[in-house]
Regions:
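Positively charged, low-complexity terminal tracts
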Residues: 1-6, 13-72
Length: 72
């Protein structure tokens, strides 16, 4: 069984960066880590931005967009 999750582009990019950064690595158990790796892989397949030469700028814009939308 699978599910579908819909994210805005900026949400997906910021989430991908969090997962790829391994900031959560030490704080989760193996089953959760495996699920996060699967999610990271799915996002990586969908996003072009991480492979862009101006990735840092695109990521900063996405972060700013989320702050404006949801607040701090």
């Amino acid at each position: 069984m699978s599910i579908t999750i819909t994210l805005e582009q900026d949400e997906a990019l910021v989430l991908f960066e969090l997962l790829a950064s391994e900031k959560l690595e030490a704080s989760v158990d193996t089953p959760e880590r495996n699920a996060l790796w699967a999610l990271e892989g799915l996002l990586e397949k969908q996003l072009a931005e991480p492979f862009s030469p101006n990735y840092s700028e695109l990521l900063q814009e996405a972060r700013q967009s989320l702050l404006e939308r949801y607040g701090r």
